[in-house]
Amino acid sequence: MPRHPFSPSFLAASVFCAATPALAALQPIAEAPLAGETEFRCQFNADNSTDCVSTYSFTILKPSGREMLSRIDRSYAETDSLIVEKAELTQPGGKPVPLDQSQIDTRTAPNPDQGFLRERQTSLAFPNLRVGPRISYTLREHFTAKPLSTQFHYILSRPPMPVRDDRFVAEFKAERPIFVRSELMDAYRIEQSADKKTLKVSLKKPQYTNYINEAGNAYLRHTPRLELGSSLDLQDNFGPFAARYNEILAAELPKGAAAAVAAVKGKPAREQVAGLMQYINDTYRYLGDWRASERGYVPFSLAEIERNGYGDCKDLAILLAAMLKAAGIKAEPTLVSRGDVVWDLLVPGMYAPNHAIVRAEVDGKTWWLDPTNPVFAPGRTMPDIQQRWALVLGADGKVRRDEIPLEAPGDTLRVTRSEHYTHDGEARVESRVELSNAPLMQLSVADRQRGRTSTDQDLCRNFAKEGSDCVLERDDSQFVLPPSYTISARLTDRRALDRLGGEYFYNRQDLASQWDAFAKYRSEGQLAELYLGEPQITSYDISLSGGKTDEPAHSCEIRSPWFDIDLQAEPAKDGGYHYRYREVQKTSWLNHDEINSAEFGKLIEQSRGCVEQLRLVVKLDKRP
Protein backbone atom coordinates (compact mmCIF):
# COMPACT_ATOMS: atom_id res chain seq x y z
CA MET A 1 0.00 0.00 0.00
CA PRO A 2 1.32 3.49 -0.76
CA ARG A 3 2.25 5.79 2.12
CA HIS A 4 2.34 9.19 0.40
CA PRO A 5 -0.38 10.62 -1.82
CA PHE A 6 2.39 12.35 -3.79
CA SER A 7 6.00 13.26 -3.37
CA PRO A 8 7.10 16.87 -2.86
CA SER A 9 10.06 16.38 -5.18
CA PHE A 10 11.27 14.47 -8.21
CA LEU A 11 14.31 13.76 -6.06
CA ALA A 12 12.32 11.62 -3.65
CA ALA A 13 13.53 8.31 -5.04
CA SER A 14 17.21 9.21 -5.10
CA VAL A 15 17.57 11.63 -2.20
CA PHE A 16 15.02 10.39 0.30
CA CYS A 17 16.18 6.78 -0.03
CA ALA A 18 19.73 7.88 0.66
CA ALA A 19 18.64 9.62 3.83
CA THR A 20 16.30 7.11 5.46
CA PRO A 21 18.77 4.74 7.10
CA ALA A 22 21.18 7.34 8.39
CA LEU A 23 24.81 6.55 7.64
CA ALA A 24 27.39 9.44 12.13
CA ALA A 25 28.25 13.00 12.31
CA LEU A 26 26.53 15.84 10.50
CA GLN A 27 28.13 16.62 7.16
CA PRO A 28 29.62 20.15 6.93
CA ILE A 29 27.59 22.57 4.86
CA ALA A 30 30.63 23.21 2.65
CA GLU A 31 30.31 19.63 1.39
CA ALA A 32 26.68 19.94 0.29
CA PRO A 33 26.42 18.58 -3.28
CA LEU A 34 23.29 20.57 -4.14
CA ALA A 35 21.52 23.76 -3.14
CA GLY A 36 17.75 23.57 -3.46
CA GLU A 37 14.70 25.81 -3.51
CA THR A 38 11.16 24.47 -3.36
CA GLU A 39 7.82 26.18 -3.77
CA PHE A 40 4.48 24.47 -4.24
CA ARG A 41 0.76 25.06 -3.84
CA CYS A 42 -1.84 22.34 -3.33
CA GLN A 43 -5.63 22.45 -3.35
CA PHE A 44 -7.65 19.72 -1.59
CA ASN A 45 -10.88 19.55 -3.58
CA ALA A 46 -14.42 18.76 -2.45
CA ASP A 47 -14.36 15.40 -4.26
CA ASN A 48 -11.23 14.47 -2.29
CA SER A 49 -8.94 14.84 -5.28
CA THR A 50 -5.87 17.08 -5.07
CA ASP A 51 -4.28 19.57 -7.46
CA CYS A 52 -0.71 20.78 -7.01
CA VAL A 53 1.65 23.14 -8.83
CA SER A 54 5.25 22.86 -7.71
CA THR A 55 8.58 24.37 -8.70
CA TYR A 56 11.93 22.82 -7.79
CA SER A 57 15.29 24.47 -8.40
CA PHE A 58 18.73 22.97 -7.77
CA THR A 59 22.21 24.43 -8.13
CA ILE A 60 25.00 21.88 -8.57
CA LEU A 61 27.73 22.52 -6.00
CA LYS A 62 29.75 19.29 -6.22
CA PRO A 63 30.30 16.59 -8.86
CA SER A 64 28.16 14.19 -6.81
CA GLY A 65 25.29 16.66 -7.14
CA ARG A 66 25.42 16.27 -10.91
CA GLU A 67 24.96 12.52 -10.54
CA MET A 68 21.97 13.03 -8.27
CA LEU A 69 20.30 15.04 -11.03
CA SER A 70 21.45 12.84 -13.90
CA ARG A 71 17.92 11.61 -14.61
CA ILE A 72 14.86 12.68 -12.67
CA ASP A 73 11.93 10.25 -12.60
CA ARG A 74 8.37 10.75 -11.45
CA SER A 75 5.85 7.88 -11.36
CA TYR A 76 2.13 8.48 -10.98
CA ALA A 77 -1.07 6.47 -11.17
CA GLU A 78 -2.71 6.03 -14.54
CA THR A 79 -5.77 7.81 -13.16
CA ASP A 80 -3.67 10.84 -12.17
CA SER A 81 -2.03 13.38 -14.46
CA LEU A 82 1.31 15.18 -14.61
CA ILE A 83 2.32 18.05 -16.87
CA VAL A 84 5.83 19.50 -17.00
CA GLU A 85 4.89 23.15 -17.41
CA LYS A 86 8.44 24.44 -17.50
CA ALA A 87 11.94 22.99 -17.29
CA GLU A 88 15.09 24.99 -17.87
CA LEU A 89 18.84 25.00 -17.35
CA THR A 90 20.82 28.11 -16.44
CA GLN A 91 24.60 28.20 -16.78
CA PRO A 92 26.53 30.55 -14.44
CA GLY A 93 26.11 34.10 -15.77
CA GLY A 94 23.83 32.90 -18.55
CA LYS A 95 20.14 33.02 -19.36
CA PRO A 96 17.66 30.18 -18.72
CA VAL A 97 17.53 27.69 -21.59
CA PRO A 98 14.32 25.63 -21.88
CA LEU A 99 14.72 21.87 -21.78
CA ASP A 100 14.05 20.39 -25.20
CA GLN A 101 10.96 18.21 -25.35
CA SER A 102 13.13 15.34 -26.57
CA GLN A 103 14.69 15.28 -23.09
CA ILE A 104 11.29 14.73 -21.45
CA ASP A 105 10.04 11.17 -21.75
CA THR A 106 6.76 9.66 -20.55
CA ARG A 107 6.11 5.92 -20.63
CA THR A 108 4.55 3.08 -18.67
CA ALA A 109 6.33 2.68 -15.34
CA PRO A 110 7.95 -0.69 -14.56
CA ASN A 111 6.05 -3.10 -12.33
CA PRO A 112 7.27 -3.76 -8.79
CA ASP A 113 8.85 -7.13 -7.98
CA GLN A 114 5.62 -8.57 -6.61
CA GLY A 115 2.77 -6.89 -8.38
CA PHE A 116 1.10 -5.20 -11.31
CA LEU A 117 0.71 -1.43 -11.38
CA ARG A 118 -1.05 0.84 -13.81
CA GLU A 119 1.40 3.72 -13.50
CA ARG A 120 3.01 6.18 -15.84
CA GLN A 121 6.50 7.58 -15.45
CA THR A 122 7.87 10.91 -16.67
CA SER A 123 11.64 11.40 -16.81
CA LEU A 124 13.73 14.52 -17.33
CA ALA A 125 17.36 14.50 -18.50
CA PHE A 126 19.08 17.90 -18.41
CA PRO A 127 22.06 18.21 -20.82
CA ASN A 128 25.53 19.58 -20.08
CA LEU A 129 25.37 19.21 -16.33
CA ARG A 130 28.50 20.17 -14.41
CA VAL A 131 29.35 22.03 -11.23
CA GLY A 132 27.76 25.48 -11.29
CA PRO A 133 24.56 25.27 -13.41
CA ARG A 134 21.07 25.59 -11.99
CA ILE A 135 18.14 23.49 -13.11
CA SER A 136 14.51 24.32 -12.48
CA TYR A 137 11.26 22.61 -13.35
CA THR A 138 7.58 23.24 -12.66
CA LEU A 139 5.00 20.46 -12.44
CA ARG A 140 1.23 20.56 -12.54
CA GLU A 141 -0.26 17.41 -11.00
CA HIS A 142 -3.75 16.10 -10.38
CA PHE A 143 -4.36 13.24 -7.97
CA THR A 144 -7.70 11.48 -8.07
CA ALA A 145 -9.38 10.44 -4.84
CA LYS A 146 -8.69 6.91 -3.62
CA PRO A 147 -11.68 4.53 -3.67
CA LEU A 148 -13.96 4.97 -0.62
CA SER A 149 -11.84 7.77 0.83
CA THR A 150 -13.95 10.66 2.10
CA GLN A 151 -11.19 12.59 3.90
CA PHE A 152 -7.95 14.05 2.64
CA HIS A 153 -4.61 13.29 4.25
CA TYR A 154 -1.22 14.72 3.35
CA ILE A 155 2.23 13.95 4.78
CA LEU A 156 5.04 16.47 4.37
CA SER A 157 8.27 14.83 5.50
CA ARG A 158 11.52 16.80 5.57
CA PRO A 159 14.21 14.25 6.48
CA PRO A 160 17.93 15.01 6.39
CA MET A 161 19.21 14.85 2.83
CA PRO A 162 22.32 15.89 0.87
CA VAL A 163 20.72 19.14 -0.33
CA ARG A 164 21.34 22.57 1.16
CA ASP A 165 17.85 23.91 1.77
CA ASP A 166 17.98 27.56 0.72
CA ARG A 167 14.25 28.17 0.47
CA PHE A 168 11.09 26.18 1.08
CA VAL A 169 7.53 27.48 0.81
CA ALA A 170 4.36 25.37 0.67
CA GLU A 171 0.77 26.58 0.58
CA PHE A 172 -2.30 24.40 1.07
CA LYS A 173 -5.95 25.26 0.54
CA ALA A 174 -9.10 23.26 1.16
CA GLU A 175 -12.85 23.72 1.05
CA ARG A 176 -13.11 22.49 4.64
CA PRO A 177 -10.96 23.14 7.73
CA ILE A 178 -7.47 21.65 7.73
CA PHE A 179 -6.32 19.86 10.87
CA VAL A 180 -2.57 20.18 11.42
CA ARG A 181 -0.23 18.00 13.47
CA SER A 182 3.57 18.10 13.40
CA GLU A 183 6.82 17.06 15.03
CA LEU A 184 10.30 18.61 14.95
CA MET A 185 9.14 21.46 12.69
CA ASP A 186 10.86 24.23 14.70
CA ALA A 187 12.88 25.32 11.65
CA TYR A 188 9.66 26.17 9.81
CA ARG A 189 7.07 28.91 10.15
CA ILE A 190 3.53 27.50 10.09
CA GLU A 191 0.71 30.00 9.48
CA GLN A 192 -2.98 29.12 9.25
CA SER A 193 -5.92 31.32 8.32
CA ALA A 194 -8.70 32.08 10.78
CA ASP A 195 -11.12 29.75 8.99
CA LYS A 196 -8.48 26.94 9.03
CA LYS A 197 -8.85 26.45 5.26
CA THR A 198 -5.48 27.88 4.21
CA LEU A 199 -2.05 26.92 5.50
CA LYS A 200 1.41 28.24 4.68
CA VAL A 201 4.66 26.52 5.65
CA SER A 202 8.00 28.26 5.10
CA LEU A 203 11.59 27.66 6.10
CA LYS A 204 12.77 30.33 8.54
CA LYS A 205 16.37 30.37 7.28
CA PRO A 206 18.58 28.25 5.01
CA GLN A 207 19.82 25.00 6.52
CA TYR A 208 21.78 21.86 5.71
CA THR A 209 21.26 18.61 7.59
CA ASN A 210 22.79 15.39 6.34
CA TYR A 211 24.15 12.43 8.30
CA ILE A 212 27.30 10.58 7.30
CA ASN A 213 29.05 7.39 8.43
CA GLU A 214 26.40 6.06 10.77
CA ALA A 215 26.16 2.36 11.59
CA GLY A 216 24.48 -0.04 9.19
CA ASN A 217 21.61 -0.59 11.64
CA ALA A 218 21.11 3.14 12.29
CA TYR A 219 17.84 4.92 11.53
CA LEU A 220 16.12 8.22 12.19
CA ARG A 221 12.80 7.43 13.83
CA HIS A 222 11.87 11.09 14.21
CA THR A 223 12.41 13.69 11.49
CA PRO A 224 10.66 16.99 10.69
CA ARG A 225 7.15 16.06 9.64
CA LEU A 226 3.89 17.89 9.06
CA GLU A 227 0.60 16.08 8.53
CA LEU A 228 -2.63 17.60 7.28
CA GLY A 229 -6.08 16.06 7.34
CA SER A 230 -9.73 16.94 7.07
CA SER A 231 -10.50 14.91 10.21
CA LEU A 232 -8.68 13.47 13.22
CA ASP A 233 -11.42 10.92 13.82
CA LEU A 234 -10.70 7.27 13.06
CA GLN A 235 -14.27 6.60 12.00
CA ASP A 236 -14.31 9.51 9.58
CA ASN A 237 -11.12 8.32 7.92
CA PHE A 238 -11.58 4.55 7.93
CA GLY A 239 -15.28 3.94 8.56
CA PRO A 240 -16.10 3.51 4.84
CA PHE A 241 -13.33 0.93 4.54
CA ALA A 242 -14.57 -0.97 7.60
CA ALA A 243 -18.04 -1.12 6.05
CA ARG A 244 -16.68 -2.47 2.76
CA TYR A 245 -14.47 -5.04 4.52
CA ASN A 246 -17.48 -6.30 6.46
CA GLU A 247 -19.49 -6.60 3.24
CA ILE A 248 -16.74 -8.79 1.79
CA LEU A 249 -16.51 -10.85 4.99
CA ALA A 250 -20.26 -11.47 4.94
CA ALA A 251 -20.04 -13.35 1.64
CA GLU A 252 -20.01 -17.14 1.50
CA LEU A 253 -16.58 -18.70 1.58
CA PRO A 254 -15.45 -19.97 -1.81
CA LYS A 255 -15.06 -23.70 -2.25
CA GLY A 256 -11.34 -24.04 -1.51
CA ALA A 257 -11.41 -21.85 1.58
CA ALA A 258 -14.50 -23.63 2.91
CA ALA A 259 -12.78 -27.00 2.48
CA ALA A 260 -9.73 -25.73 4.38
CA VAL A 261 -11.93 -24.61 7.26
CA ALA A 262 -13.68 -27.98 7.31
CA ALA A 263 -10.29 -29.74 7.41
CA VAL A 264 -9.30 -28.05 10.69
CA LYS A 265 -12.72 -28.32 12.33
CA GLY A 266 -12.61 -29.81 15.82
CA LYS A 267 -8.92 -29.11 16.39
CA PRO A 268 -7.71 -26.79 19.17
CA ALA A 269 -7.90 -23.12 18.17
CA ARG A 270 -4.11 -22.83 18.01
CA GLU A 271 -3.91 -25.68 15.51
CA GLN A 272 -6.81 -24.31 13.48
CA VAL A 273 -5.01 -21.00 13.04
CA ALA A 274 -1.80 -22.78 12.06
CA GLY A 275 -3.69 -24.95 9.58
CA LEU A 276 -5.37 -21.99 7.90
CA MET A 277 -2.11 -20.02 7.74
CA GLN A 278 -0.52 -23.09 6.15
CA TYR A 279 -3.35 -23.32 3.62
CA ILE A 280 -2.91 -19.70 2.53
CA ASN A 281 0.84 -20.15 2.27
CA ASP A 282 0.45 -23.31 0.18
CA THR A 283 -2.32 -22.00 -2.06
CA TYR A 284 -1.69 -18.28 -2.56
CA ARG A 285 1.30 -16.21 -3.51
CA TYR A 286 1.87 -12.60 -2.55
CA LEU A 287 1.15 -10.43 -5.58
CA GLY A 288 -0.48 -7.03 -5.77
CA ASP A 289 -2.78 -6.44 -8.74
CA TRP A 290 -3.94 -2.94 -9.67
CA ARG A 291 -4.44 -3.63 -13.38
CA ALA A 292 -8.21 -3.31 -13.37
CA SER A 293 -8.33 -0.21 -11.18
CA GLU A 294 -6.63 1.70 -8.40
CA ARG A 295 -8.03 -0.28 -5.46
CA GLY A 296 -6.35 1.64 -2.62
CA TYR A 297 -7.28 -0.17 0.57
CA VAL A 298 -10.19 -2.10 -0.97
CA PRO A 299 -9.57 -5.87 -1.30
CA PHE A 300 -10.87 -8.14 -4.00
CA SER A 301 -13.94 -10.21 -3.10
CA LEU A 302 -13.32 -13.63 -1.56
CA ALA A 303 -14.34 -15.31 -4.81
CA GLU A 304 -11.96 -13.14 -6.84
CA ILE A 305 -9.08 -13.89 -4.47
CA GLU A 306 -9.64 -17.64 -4.78
CA ARG A 307 -10.00 -17.40 -8.53
CA ASN A 308 -6.76 -15.41 -8.85
CA GLY A 309 -4.71 -17.62 -6.54
CA TYR A 310 -2.77 -14.59 -5.37
CA GLY A 311 -3.27 -11.36 -3.49
CA ASP A 312 -1.55 -8.51 -1.73
CA CYS A 313 -1.67 -7.86 2.01
CA LYS A 314 -5.29 -6.68 2.14
CA ASP A 315 -6.49 -9.57 -0.02
CA LEU A 316 -4.76 -12.28 2.01
CA ALA A 317 -5.69 -10.60 5.30
CA ILE A 318 -9.39 -10.47 4.52
CA LEU A 319 -9.36 -14.06 3.25
CA LEU A 320 -7.67 -15.22 6.47
CA ALA A 321 -10.13 -13.22 8.58
CA ALA A 322 -13.08 -14.78 6.74
CA MET A 323 -11.72 -18.31 7.22
CA LEU A 324 -11.00 -17.75 10.91
CA LYS A 325 -14.49 -16.36 11.47
CA ALA A 326 -15.96 -19.39 9.71
CA ALA A 327 -13.94 -21.58 12.09
CA GLY A 328 -15.45 -19.77 15.08
CA ILE A 329 -12.39 -17.68 15.91
CA LYS A 330 -12.86 -13.95 16.36
CA ALA A 331 -10.84 -12.21 13.66
CA GLU A 332 -10.73 -8.60 12.47
CA PRO A 333 -8.82 -7.03 9.56
CA THR A 334 -6.30 -4.51 10.86
CA LEU A 335 -4.22 -1.75 9.27
CA VAL A 336 -0.66 -1.09 10.47
CA SER A 337 2.57 0.54 9.36
CA ARG A 338 4.98 -2.30 8.66
CA GLY A 339 8.78 -2.10 8.87
CA ASP A 340 11.63 -1.56 11.30
CA VAL A 341 10.75 2.13 11.66
CA VAL A 342 7.19 3.25 12.36
CA TRP A 343 6.07 6.85 12.72
CA ASP A 344 3.91 8.05 15.57
CA LEU A 345 0.28 8.41 14.53
CA LEU A 346 -0.11 12.17 14.14
CA VAL A 347 -3.14 12.16 11.84
CA PRO A 348 -5.07 8.86 11.57
CA GLY A 349 -5.52 9.31 7.84
CA MET A 350 -5.36 6.88 4.96
CA TYR A 351 -1.62 7.33 4.35
CA ALA A 352 -0.63 6.44 7.92
CA PRO A 353 -0.81 2.62 7.48
CA ASN A 354 0.91 0.72 4.69
CA HIS A 355 -0.02 -2.89 5.45
CA ALA A 356 -2.99 -5.08 6.35
CA ILE A 357 -2.92 -7.93 8.89
CA VAL A 358 -5.45 -9.76 11.09
CA ARG A 359 -6.16 -9.40 14.79
CA ALA A 360 -7.40 -12.71 16.19
CA GLU A 361 -8.39 -13.91 19.64
CA VAL A 362 -6.97 -17.38 20.26
CA ASP A 363 -7.40 -19.16 23.60
CA GLY A 364 -8.00 -15.86 25.36
CA LYS A 365 -4.93 -14.17 23.88
CA THR A 366 -4.51 -11.67 21.07
CA TRP A 367 -2.60 -12.88 18.03
CA TRP A 368 -1.45 -10.53 15.27
CA LEU A 369 -1.36 -12.55 12.05
CA ASP A 370 0.38 -11.60 8.81
CA PRO A 371 -0.46 -14.09 6.03
CA THR A 372 2.02 -12.48 3.62
CA ASN A 373 5.02 -13.91 5.47
CA PRO A 374 6.81 -17.11 4.35
CA VAL A 375 6.93 -18.42 7.95
CA PHE A 376 4.53 -18.59 10.89
CA ALA A 377 5.38 -18.87 14.58
CA PRO A 378 2.12 -19.65 16.43
CA GLY A 379 1.43 -17.12 19.15
CA ARG A 380 4.32 -14.84 18.24
CA THR A 381 4.09 -11.53 16.40
CA MET A 382 6.47 -11.01 13.49
CA PRO A 383 9.28 -8.56 14.33
CA ASP A 384 8.31 -6.02 11.65
CA ILE A 385 4.88 -5.33 13.16
CA GLN A 386 5.75 -5.33 16.88
CA GLN A 387 5.64 -2.27 19.16
CA ARG A 388 3.28 -0.02 17.17
CA TRP A 389 -0.26 1.23 16.76
CA ALA A 390 -2.88 -0.79 14.90
CA LEU A 391 -6.21 0.31 13.41
CA VAL A 392 -8.72 -2.50 13.87
CA LEU A 393 -11.74 -2.67 11.54
CA GLY A 394 -14.38 -4.11 13.84
CA ALA A 395 -17.25 -6.39 12.84
CA ASP A 396 -19.65 -3.67 14.02
CA GLY A 397 -18.19 -1.24 11.50
CA LYS A 398 -16.38 0.71 14.20
CA VAL A 399 -12.69 1.46 13.82
CA ARG A 400 -10.59 1.45 16.96
CA ARG A 401 -6.95 1.94 17.81
CA ASP A 402 -5.05 -0.90 19.45
CA GLU A 403 -1.38 -1.37 20.34
CA ILE A 404 0.79 -4.29 19.26
CA PRO A 405 3.25 -4.93 22.09
CA LEU A 406 6.94 -5.71 21.89
CA GLU A 407 7.50 -9.41 22.41
CA ALA A 408 9.26 -10.41 25.62
CA PRO A 409 12.76 -11.90 25.25
CA GLY A 410 12.70 -15.61 24.48
CA ASP A 411 15.40 -18.28 24.29
CA THR A 412 16.39 -17.43 20.75
CA LEU A 413 19.74 -19.21 20.55
CA ARG A 414 21.08 -21.91 22.87
CA VAL A 415 24.44 -23.46 22.04
CA THR A 416 26.04 -26.47 23.69
CA ARG A 417 29.51 -27.00 22.24
CA SER A 418 32.69 -28.96 22.87
CA GLU A 419 36.07 -28.28 21.31
CA HIS A 420 38.89 -30.82 21.61
CA TYR A 421 42.27 -29.43 20.49
CA THR A 422 45.06 -31.25 18.72
CA HIS A 423 48.77 -30.47 18.98
CA ASP A 424 48.67 -28.03 16.03
CA GLY A 425 45.79 -25.84 17.21
CA GLU A 426 43.01 -27.53 15.28
CA ALA A 427 39.88 -28.68 17.10
CA ARG A 428 37.35 -31.40 16.70
CA VAL A 429 34.03 -29.69 17.29
CA GLU A 430 30.68 -31.08 18.33
CA SER A 431 27.87 -28.60 18.70
CA ARG A 432 24.16 -28.65 19.41
CA VAL A 433 22.20 -25.51 18.63
CA GLU A 434 18.57 -24.81 19.53
CA LEU A 435 16.93 -22.03 17.54
CA SER A 436 13.65 -20.21 17.99
CA ASN A 437 11.96 -16.96 17.01
CA ALA A 438 13.81 -14.66 14.56
CA PRO A 439 16.87 -16.89 13.86
CA LEU A 440 14.60 -19.85 13.19
CA MET A 441 12.46 -17.72 10.89
CA GLN A 442 15.58 -16.69 8.98
CA LEU A 443 16.67 -20.32 8.65
CA SER A 444 13.28 -21.41 7.33
CA VAL A 445 13.17 -18.56 4.83
CA ALA A 446 16.73 -19.33 3.68
CA ASP A 447 15.82 -22.98 3.10
CA ARG A 448 12.75 -21.91 1.14
CA GLN A 449 14.43 -19.28 -1.01
CA ARG A 450 17.94 -20.70 -1.55
CA GLY A 451 17.62 -24.40 -0.83
CA ARG A 452 18.90 -26.55 2.01
CA THR A 453 22.39 -27.12 0.57
CA SER A 454 23.11 -23.41 0.44
CA THR A 455 21.80 -22.93 3.98
CA ASP A 456 23.87 -25.84 5.28
CA GLN A 457 27.01 -24.34 3.80
CA ASP A 458 26.28 -21.06 5.58
CA LEU A 459 25.64 -22.90 8.84
CA CYS A 460 28.94 -24.78 8.58
CA ARG A 461 30.77 -21.48 8.05
CA ASN A 462 29.28 -20.18 11.29
CA PHE A 463 30.39 -23.22 13.29
CA ALA A 464 34.12 -22.59 12.73
CA LYS A 465 36.69 -19.99 11.74
CA GLU A 466 38.01 -22.37 9.08
CA GLY A 467 35.88 -25.49 8.99
CA SER A 468 36.16 -28.82 7.21
CA ASP A 469 34.49 -32.23 7.39
CA CYS A 470 31.27 -30.52 8.46
CA VAL A 471 28.35 -32.89 9.03
CA LEU A 472 24.98 -31.45 10.02
CA GLU A 473 21.92 -33.19 11.37
CA ARG A 474 18.64 -31.29 11.29
CA ASP A 475 15.04 -31.82 10.31
CA ASP A 476 13.53 -30.16 7.29
CA SER A 477 12.39 -26.66 8.17
CA GLN A 478 8.68 -25.91 7.89
CA PHE A 479 6.33 -23.00 7.30
CA VAL A 480 4.76 -23.48 10.74
CA LEU A 481 7.68 -23.16 13.14
CA PRO A 482 8.04 -25.39 16.21
CA PRO A 483 8.78 -23.82 19.62
CA SER A 484 12.45 -24.79 19.11
CA TYR A 485 14.53 -26.38 16.38
CA THR A 486 17.73 -28.37 16.87
CA ILE A 487 20.84 -28.47 14.69
CA SER A 488 23.68 -30.87 15.51
CA ALA A 489 27.09 -30.38 13.94
CA ARG A 490 30.36 -32.30 13.85
CA LEU A 491 33.37 -30.76 12.14
CA THR A 492 37.02 -29.81 12.31
CA ASP A 493 38.05 -26.20 12.91
CA ARG A 494 41.51 -25.80 11.38
CA ARG A 495 41.98 -22.41 13.03
CA ALA A 496 40.25 -22.93 16.35
CA LEU A 497 42.96 -21.07 18.28
CA ASP A 498 44.78 -17.87 17.45
CA ARG A 499 48.54 -18.14 17.40
CA LEU A 500 50.84 -15.34 18.53
CA GLY A 501 54.51 -16.15 18.68
CA GLY A 502 54.78 -19.57 20.21
CA GLU A 503 51.51 -19.38 22.16
CA TYR A 504 47.92 -20.33 21.33
CA PHE A 505 44.96 -18.25 22.44
CA TYR A 506 41.23 -18.93 22.71
CA ASN A 507 38.95 -15.89 22.53
CA ARG A 508 35.31 -14.95 21.91
CA GLN A 509 35.75 -11.83 19.81
CA ASP A 510 32.27 -12.45 18.39
CA LEU A 511 30.79 -11.70 21.83
CA ALA A 512 32.86 -8.52 22.08
CA SER A 513 31.99 -7.13 18.64
CA GLN A 514 28.66 -5.68 19.77
CA TRP A 515 30.27 -3.76 22.62
CA ASP A 516 33.05 -2.57 20.31
CA ALA A 517 30.38 -1.19 17.98
CA PHE A 518 28.68 0.68 20.83
CA ALA A 519 32.03 2.13 21.93
CA LYS A 520 32.68 3.22 18.34
CA TYR A 521 29.27 4.91 18.24
CA ARG A 522 30.25 7.00 21.29
CA SER A 523 33.80 7.80 20.21
CA GLU A 524 32.84 8.80 16.65
CA GLY A 525 29.93 10.96 17.72
CA GLN A 526 27.28 9.02 15.86
CA LEU A 527 23.78 10.44 16.14
CA ALA A 528 21.07 8.09 14.90
CA GLU A 529 19.15 5.41 16.75
CA LEU A 530 20.21 1.76 16.53
CA TYR A 531 17.82 -1.07 15.72
CA LEU A 532 18.77 -4.32 17.47
CA GLY A 533 15.93 -6.56 16.32
CA GLU A 534 13.38 -8.08 18.66
CA PRO A 535 14.36 -8.82 22.29
CA GLN A 536 16.11 -12.15 22.67
CA ILE A 537 18.12 -14.42 24.94
CA THR A 538 21.30 -16.12 23.75
CA SER A 539 23.21 -18.65 25.83
CA TYR A 540 26.35 -20.73 25.42
CA ASP A 541 27.53 -23.81 27.32
CA ILE A 542 31.09 -24.43 26.11
CA SER A 543 33.61 -27.13 27.04
CA LEU A 544 37.27 -26.90 25.94
CA SER A 545 39.61 -29.91 26.16
CA GLY A 546 42.78 -31.36 24.64
CA GLY A 547 44.93 -28.61 26.09
CA LYS A 548 45.57 -26.97 29.44
CA THR A 549 45.04 -23.46 30.68
CA ASP A 550 46.07 -21.77 33.91
CA GLU A 551 43.11 -19.41 33.76
CA PRO A 552 41.25 -19.30 37.09
CA ALA A 553 37.49 -19.28 37.58
CA HIS A 554 35.62 -16.13 36.55
CA SER A 555 32.10 -14.85 36.92
CA CYS A 556 30.09 -11.83 35.79
CA GLU A 557 26.63 -10.61 36.71
CA ILE A 558 25.71 -7.44 34.83
CA ARG A 559 22.30 -5.82 35.04
CA SER A 560 21.00 -2.81 33.11
CA PRO A 561 17.75 -1.54 31.54
CA TRP A 562 18.99 -2.77 28.14
CA PHE A 563 21.00 -5.97 28.66
CA ASP A 564 21.61 -8.57 31.35
CA ILE A 565 24.78 -10.66 31.16
CA ASP A 566 25.88 -13.66 33.20
CA LEU A 567 29.12 -15.62 32.98
CA GLN A 568 30.25 -18.62 34.98
CA ALA A 569 33.67 -19.95 33.94
CA GLU A 570 35.93 -22.47 35.68
CA PRO A 571 38.81 -24.87 34.99
CA ALA A 572 37.80 -28.44 34.16
CA LYS A 573 39.22 -31.46 35.96
CA ASP A 574 41.06 -32.61 32.82
CA GLY A 575 42.95 -29.33 32.58
CA GLY A 576 40.55 -27.83 30.07
CA TYR A 577 38.01 -25.10 30.66
CA HIS A 578 34.23 -24.81 30.85
CA TYR A 579 32.00 -21.74 30.79
CA ARG A 580 28.35 -20.73 30.55
CA TYR A 581 27.49 -17.35 29.06
CA ARG A 582 23.99 -15.85 28.88
CA GLU A 583 22.92 -12.52 27.40
CA VAL A 584 19.41 -11.05 27.59
CA GLN A 585 18.61 -8.24 25.14
CA LYS A 586 15.58 -6.42 26.58
CA THR A 587 14.90 -3.77 23.96
CA SER A 588 14.71 -3.42 20.20
CA TRP A 589 15.92 0.20 19.99
CA LEU A 590 18.72 2.27 21.52
CA ASN A 591 18.57 6.03 21.10
CA HIS A 592 21.42 8.53 21.04
CA ASP A 593 20.99 9.73 24.61
CA GLU A 594 20.83 6.20 25.99
CA ILE A 595 24.01 5.07 24.24
CA ASN A 596 25.89 8.17 25.40
CA SER A 597 24.67 7.97 28.99
CA ALA A 598 27.06 7.24 31.86
CA GLU A 599 25.05 4.12 32.71
CA PHE A 600 25.42 2.73 29.19
CA GLY A 601 29.12 3.58 29.19
CA LYS A 602 29.47 1.53 32.36
CA LEU A 603 27.59 -1.33 30.67
CA ILE A 604 30.04 -1.27 27.74
CA GLU A 605 33.03 -1.32 30.07
CA GLN A 606 31.64 -4.14 32.20
CA SER A 607 30.56 -6.24 29.22
CA ARG A 608 33.89 -5.88 27.46
CA GLY A 609 35.68 -6.84 30.66
CA CYS A 610 33.43 -9.87 31.08
CA VAL A 611 34.10 -11.15 27.56
CA GLU A 612 37.81 -10.41 27.92
CA GLN A 613 37.92 -13.00 30.69
CA LEU A 614 37.32 -15.62 28.01
CA ARG A 615 40.68 -14.87 26.38
CA LEU A 616 42.65 -17.94 27.43
CA VAL A 617 46.23 -19.04 26.90
CA VAL A 618 46.01 -22.72 25.88
CA LYS A 619 48.97 -25.07 26.27
CA LEU A 620 48.56 -27.87 23.77
CA ASP A 621 49.67 -31.45 24.21
CA LYS A 622 52.87 -32.29 22.38
CA ARG A 623 52.82 -33.99 18.99
CA PRO A 624 52.14 -37.72 19.55
Model-derived segments and spans:
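Gram-negative bacterial Sec-dependent N-terminal signal peptides
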Residues: 2-23
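A sensor for short, sequence-defined functional sites
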Residues: 24-624
